[in-house]
Amino acid sequence: MAASNFMGSSARLRVGLLPSVTPRLSRRALATRASADSGGSGPVRVRFAPSPTGNLHVGGARTALFNYLFARSRGGKFVLRVEDTDLERSTKKSEEAVLTDLSWLGLDWDEGPDIGGDFGPYRQSERNALYKEHAQKLMESGAVYRCFCSNEELEKMKETANRMKIPPVYMGKWATASDAEVQQELEKGTPYTYRFRVPKEGSLKINDLIRGEVSWNLNTLGDFVIMRSNGQPVYNFCVTVDDATMRISHVIRAEEHLPNTLRQALIYKALGFAMPLFAHVSLILAPDKSKLSKRHGATSVGQYKEMGYLPQAMVNYLALLGWGDGTENEFFTIDDLVEKFTIDRVNKSGAVFDATKLKWMNGQHLRSLPSDLLIKDFEDQWRSTGILLESESGFAKEAAELLKEGIDLITDADAALCKLLSYPLHETLSSDEAKSVVEDKLSEVASGLISAYDSGELDQALAEGHDGWKKWVKSFGKTHKRKGKSLFMPLRVLLTGKLHGPAMDSTVILVHKAGTSGAVAPQSGFVSLDERFKILKEVNWESLQKQQESPVESAVPAAS
């Protein structure tokens, strides 16, 4: 292509660039759902385009979520496109893992590599013919040219730019080379790239739906490569061709892609495609305000899934990283989010990932599950670790109901149940906190309790459940002239071995049921009522009293 032909094309590109690529939107337009969110009268089509080179990062998951919510809230299409042009790092296993994680989150897509669609293929590695077709169009129009510069020549240009303290833009001769010079190199078989001609003057502006007006000076860019010498297309060229030919109306992505928008806008213009609207969301930050990375702990969706987090909790928490509905409400189902999500409420400042808040959020969603699902989750967890041996007795149901308020992660249910079934009487009676309980004639309560158990009275009451317990404890209190805290605190310590915990009546009834049903495995640390009363009978109360006054050694035998 002769240089004179290109210069005419370049001049036309420069003159028409700003009004064609970036129609100015008023502040009012940016704030309204109709113009800013809908992108005009065409259908809403958004995409999430992961690279299958690793696990799905929470940042990528949030980007996918925002795209999903935007599409679903406007009756649009959510497209999944796999950007696998990095052939060395891309793997099928990683692609499958990303798709699995998206499905686990409940982010179903309308078009994608697994289900197809009208605008496929949906893997970049399968779209090379399309990229070559559009690269040829740019070559024929004069928007790109062949560059025969070697790596050594390009490196020298960078060194020169550094010495001159100017942006390292392309300064080679091939932008203005004659047809004869180009033909000579082609005949020699010299490798070449395709470079895009960038206007040397002017600026480019876009109105980002989140960040507002963003502009770049074109003289800082320089001519850039769109096709490598091995025929592989470059990222920005692929993305532009893909978004244009897939008719993407809105590009919602991370702010780290904002610099790419300049190159992509130029390619859109040169190919004659309409520009989508752009929305660049903030990065997710670590508590120290640095970019969230593996050194800060778990960062992938798969890791949180393995740790026992619920998908609905992950979705809820990720949505709140940079978005809110303007109220104090923090609990949202995915249907709530679809109903309330608007792009104008996405914050442009960085959002801090708080693992503690995520765990709290998971607890909220765990406890909001229908009772049958909640119980099944607990039961499945206990069975998977071998703690629960059977569930016919109703033990799992009662244990789940008793423990759910203190559990935020289902994987914590193991430790919670083991703690509930344990009997650390030795540690409790030896503690400073128990001193007042011991001094309140605890030995007398223990003596009466042992008598009630040996006679079968207590066992019968527990077998009758809560009604039986209430009758028995009322009678026991009258006999020993105790009520309120002076009755229930000693009973809690003597029967559970603890000063604090879930409701005492439910705890003791559950311990009784565990002993009679054989519901739990020995490795749970379960101490039966029989074993508890054996320990109680061996307590040397006189020695314990002295120990409280001057601690030397334990007066309470440890549970075996």
Curated annotation (Swiss-Prot):
InterPro entries: aa-tRNA-synth_I_cd-bd (IPR045462), aa-tRNA-synth_I_codon-bd_sub2 (IPR020751), aa-tRNA-synth_I_CS (IPR001412), aa_tRNA-synth_I_cd-bd_sf (IPR008925), Glu-tRNA-ligase_bac/mito (IPR004527), Glu/Gln-tRNA-synth (IPR000924), Glu/Gln-tRNA-synth_Ib_cat-dom (IPR020058), GluQ/Sye (IPR049940)
Catalytic activity: tRNA(Glu) + L-glutamate + ATP = L-glutamyl-tRNA(Glu) + AMP + diphosphate
Residue positions of motif 'KMSKS' region: 291-295
Alphabetical list of SUPFAM superfamilies matching this protein: An anticodon-binding domain of class I aminoacyl-tRNA synthetases (SSF48163), Nucleotidylyl transferase (SSF52374)
Sequence motif 'HIGH' region, residues: 50-60
Annotated positions binding L-glutamate: 47-49, 83, 235-239, 253
Keyword match Transit peptide: yes
Gene Ontology CC annotations of this record: chloroplast; mitochondrion
Binding site for ATP: 57, 256, 291-295
Localisation per UniProt entry: Plastid, Chloroplast; Mitochondrion
Its EC number(s): 6.1.1.17
Function: Catalyzes the attachment of glutamate to tRNA(Glu) in a two-step reaction: glutamate is first activated by ATP to form Glu-AMP and then transferred to the acceptor end of tRNA(Glu).
Sequence similarity: Belongs to the class-I aminoacyl-tRNA synthetase family. Glutamate--tRNA ligase type 1 subfamily.
PANTHER family hit by this protein: GLUTAMATE--TRNA LIGASE, GLUTAMATE--TRNA LIGASE, MITOCHONDRIAL-RELATED
Name this protein carries in UniProt: Glutamate--tRNA ligase, chloroplastic/mitochondrial
Gene source species: Hordeum vulgare
